[in-house]
Amino acid sequence: MDYKQTLLMPKTAFPMRGNLPNSEPKRQEQWEEMDIYKQVQERTEGRPYFVLHDGPPYANGDIHMGHALNKIIKDFIVRYKSMSGFHAPYVPGWDTHGLPIETALTKNKKVDRKSMSIADFRKLCEEYALEQINSQRQQFMRLGVRGDWWKPYITLEKEFEAEQIKVFGKMAKKGYIYKGKKPVYWSPSSESALAEAEIEYYDKRSASIYVAFQVADGKGVLPEDAALVIWTTTPWTIPANLGITVHPQLEYSVVRTGGRSFVVASGLLEHVQTELSWEDVVVEKTVTGKELDYIVCRHPFYDRDSIVMNGEHVTLDAGTGCVHTAPGHGVDDFVVGQKYGLDVLCPIDDKGIMTSEAPGFEGEFYDNINKMVTEKLEAVGALLKLGFITHSYPHDWRTKKPVIFRATSQWFASIANIRKELLQAVANTEWIPAWGETRLHNMVRDRGDWCISRQRAWGVPIPVFYGEDGTEIVSEETIEHVSNLFREHGSNVWFEREAKDLLPPGFTSPHSPNGHFTKETDIMDVWFDSGSSHQGVLRERNDLVFPADLYFEGSDQYRGWFNSSLSTSVAINGVAPYKGVLSHGFVMDGEGKKMSKSLGNIVVPNTVMKQLGADILRLWVASVDYQADSRVSDSILKQVAETYRKIRNTFRFLLGNLHDFDPKINAVPRDQLTGVHAFLLVRLNELTKRMHEGYNEYQFLNVYNHFRNFCTVELSSFYMDISKDTLYIEHADHPERRAFQTVMYEVVTALTKLIAPILPHTADEVWENIPGVSEQSVQLTDMPTAEELSGTDELKAHWQAFMDIRADVLKALEVARNEKVIGKSLQASLTLYPNKQARALLEATEGLKKLFIVSNVQIANEGDEVPAAAQQFADVAVLVEKAEGETCERCWQVSNTVGADEKHPTLCLSCAQTVTNHYNDVV
């Protein structure tokens, strides 16, 4: 007789294999059709706002793993908040101006920039940027990131540019914008000034030279034959030398060696003596740096003086204590030079070519004249030593080529004037990790004024006009007019029209009596673009608020977007644009190495999604400690895919056993769920509480671990395992079966919501298969709440103690299996020899057979001797024997009652009764 039809086996349309690369795009099409983003916003309208403001990625190239990590975590946060009592809009953005797009056109697309006007070239830049945005948008959406993708903010859009001009105008009105000539980071490879945020440090091999500057007028302090010794790693700046700086409080020694007198800091004398191999050194006298002030030296090979000056920046960390000073090539040099009235000599052009102000080196690339300068110094007897060192040196973050300090006329945003307010804003912000506060505090404390001008074409113009006498013209009237022009026509209008056509109608100025005006040709630093987004996006969009609750980007943005946004917002608003700042580390390969084409270790998000699916990638993001550097590789992703498989199987089992369950009809009231069912609901409540804590603290690794452990430990290894006999074997409405189903319904509903921010595709797929749910998507529901359960301590204590005993029993069964005493656990009969405490526990626990998944359990009498074959544990000894009787064809338990019912000779009595009472029409 076939009893299969009397078994209630799992049934579900939820497949074992997710086939995510194929199923996810279909799911995303469904989200698009139903406009899930709009539905979520409408559902949560009226709730308190939670705004995560998107730091705009650069619109160039395919997304990489850093992009994926960043966008996915943002999605975790926004999805969770929208299911947890908040209105959480997410407006993605793109950063679109700057050199990389210019380079992409001229180098990759072979655009001849010189053959067209700036305005036409900028139009090509805009077209390229928009193409890149469309490509990246599809890739970000493929990650499952939910947002207002068809109404993003883009820094090249007219409205954004118009607001950026207003930010500039407000800062200018307050006196925070000025033009000045001073040394700035200059990139010869980009032919433009750079801000500190655009500098990266790499090792570079440089010449290291010691040079003697002969005293011309010792002022009675130094002998006329003495020479001050300087040390530098930039010989190419010697032609620009105008002075030597010493520290006023340091002691300097005048020493005689080899028939010559030299001056070095006393604290560095031993070091210099070793470096220059001086012998028979005699200290003739010591003086303070203050006494050396205004002593006159001669330039080694030009017919001009080099003045000795006092400066607090001189240290004893390296060199000689006498610092070669070229005001056109260093910030400290510039400051001390201004104090002493020196010229700002900078004999180098935009491309790094020496000019006629450096006689003998004109027309040479600056880095090539190091050797020429050294040879010249040697020829005149001024070179004391030539060596080479490898040191950390600033490079252009885009071109990866070295940068220089070069004095040029640039536009600056004053940091000094608002430094106090900036530091207060940093202190008022919540920083995660906490070290972020120290990091940005120190940057703000130490940074100079921000060079905001760039000598490029593709960017937002600096909205300044010039009168006939060269005076800068920027006023509320001109700013308002230019802003309105940009709002109507875009910033390209600046390059399409003459200055007079960009000024308000009838505009006059005493600086232009003839009515002639010119306009600024420089553009703004791209960090000013994205740094203005709090104005152009948070304040201007009706669906967002200022300040944002959270900025979340990579740790490189402390010097970038976090910094520029803070500067512009404090300047015009007096407060930071964010309440909190969260940062993440970088994505490395599986061995912790940086990904690079040369190493062949690059993991590409698009490839991962084609092979494994976006939810696997998202689960990987949840599985790493993202605040530090995280690792990814094919093998790591395979491990994550295995975890996903287990999670999916858990969902499938739960759904499969709800195929005949209607929560409105079949659910067992909560107060009637006792024993193991009540215990599991307590565990679910604890999980819910921990998951909320993890999400709220942005600790997604904790969320991942708690969820995974619940699925594998509480469910797969225990509750689901012990449920099978009841779910499959008992009749449909058996109270115990309905109890299991009720709990499983509660569990699957809660788990689906709890994991929805991390696995949105899978969660919606599960949601569709849960009986009785009304919402079209789990995204349109709220998170389960953790209840404050009272009176559960005793229940938890009982079941936790039982689980310890169960673990011992399972070990004993495993040993018996290995020793061939039994095959499957249902072939076992157990005799337990508990201690007093364990006895009370076991006697108070119903259904031991099902809890241990065996055919028979006996608790030995007190005082019974423990047989030698029993396995001894801390609280119980376990004797495993082969169960006596026959195996029931239907439930697979071994029983002496098999055949007791003549109609069903292969069934145990319990199964025979179930079949007779409930399945007479089937068999």
From Swiss-Prot:
A motif ('HIGH' region) lies at residues 57-67. Keywords: Aminoacyl-tRNA synthetase, ATP-binding, Cytoplasm, Ligase, Metal-binding, Nucleotide-binding, Protein biosynthesis, Zinc. GO terms for cellular component: cytosol. L-isoleucyl-5'-AMP binds at residue 553. Zn(2+) binds at residues 888, 891, 908, 911. It is an enzyme of class 6 (ligase). The keyword Ligase applies. It comes from the Bacteria. Binds 1 zinc ion per subunit. InterPro entries: aa-tRNA-synth_I_CS, aa-tRNA-synth_Ia, Anticodon_Ile_BEm, Ile-tRNA-ligase, Ile-tRNA-ligase_type1, Ile-tRNA_ligase, M/V/L/I-tRNA-synth_anticd-bd, Rossmann-like_a/b/a_fold. One of its GO terms (molecular function) is tRNA binding. SUPFAM superfamilies: Anticodon-binding domain of a subclass of class I aminoacyl-tRNA synthetases, Nucleotidylyl transferase, ValRS/IleRS/LeuRS editing domain. It is found in: Cytoplasm. It holds the Pfam family zf-FPG_IleRS. ATP binds at residue 597. HAMAP family: Ile_tRNA_synth_type1 (MF_02002). Belongs to the class-I aminoacyl-tRNA synthetase family. IleS type 1 subfamily. NCBIfam families: ileS. Catalyzes the attachment of isoleucine to tRNA(Ile). As IleRS can inadvertently accommodate and process structurally similar amino acids such as valine, to avoid such errors it has two additional distinct tRNA(Ile)-dependent editing activities. One activity is designated as 'pretransfer' editing and involves the hydrolysis of activated Val-AMP. The other activity is designated 'posttransfer' editing and involves deacylation of mischarged Val-tRNA(Ile). IleRS has two distinct active sites: one for aminoacylation and one for editing. The misactivated valine is translocated from the active site to the editing site, which sterically excludes the correctly activated isoleucine. The single editing site contains two valyl binding pockets, one specific for each substrate (Val-AMP or Val-tRNA(Ile)). This is Isoleucine--tRNA ligase. The lineage of its organism: Bacteria, Bacillati, Bacillota, Bacilli, Bacillales. The gene is ileS.
